[in-house]
Amino acid sequence: MAKYLAQIVLMGVQVVGRAFTRALRQEFAASKTAAEARGRAGTESAAVSSLSGISFQEAQQILNVSKLTPEEIQKNYEHLFKVNDKAVGGSFYLQSKVVRAKERLDQEMEIQSKTSNPKEET
């Protein structure tokens, strides 16, 4: 009786082990394809971040935008630029941060348009 119980447990462990390794291989393959898909855009975005000195997330926070829509970015940019004007008691430092954030988001929109329309790069 104990012999059969041990065989059943052993077979169960083998089945679970095979299923786990199969699932792990599938996950690695999916992760690899996702990384390759993000590869080019991610590299360009990182290069732009290092050149502009401001990250994409920081630029979104400064201009208070969640989606990259030119109208919303422009509207928030104009408002924050006027509010931080030195003539009305604003801060030149904050005003320059607003300008850098808009430049960074404009660059990100350009990168996204290139990756979504690769045929137009010729």
Swiss-Prot record:
InterPro entries linked to this entry: J_dom_sf, Tim16
One term under GO cellular component: TIM23 mitochondrial import inner membrane translocase complex
Pfam entry (one): Pam16
Nucleotide-binding as UniProt keyword: no
Membrane topology: Peripheral membrane protein
Any GO BP annotation: protein import into mitochondrial matrix
UniProtKB keywords: Membrane, Mitochondrion, Mitochondrion inner membrane, Protein transport, Translocation, Transport
Subcellular location: Mitochondrion inner membrane
Coiled coil: none
Region listing for J-like, in residue ranges: 58-110
Predominant cellular place of this UniProt entry's protein: mitochondrion
Function field: Probable component of the PAM complex, a complex required for the translocation of transit peptide-containing proteins from the inner membrane into the mitochondrial matrix in an ATP-dependent manner. May be required to regulate the ATP-dependent activity.
Family of the protein in this entry: Belongs to the TIM16/PAM16 family.
Assembly and binders: Probable component of the PAM complex at least composed of 1 mitochondrial HSP70 protein, 1 GRPE, 1 TIMM44, 1 TIMM16/PAM16 and 1 TIMM14.
Domain notes: The J-like region, although related to the J domain does not have co-chaperone activity.
The protein, known as: Mitochondrial import inner membrane translocase subunit tim16-B
Phylogenetic classification of the source organism: Eukaryota, Metazoa, Chordata, Craniata, Vertebrata
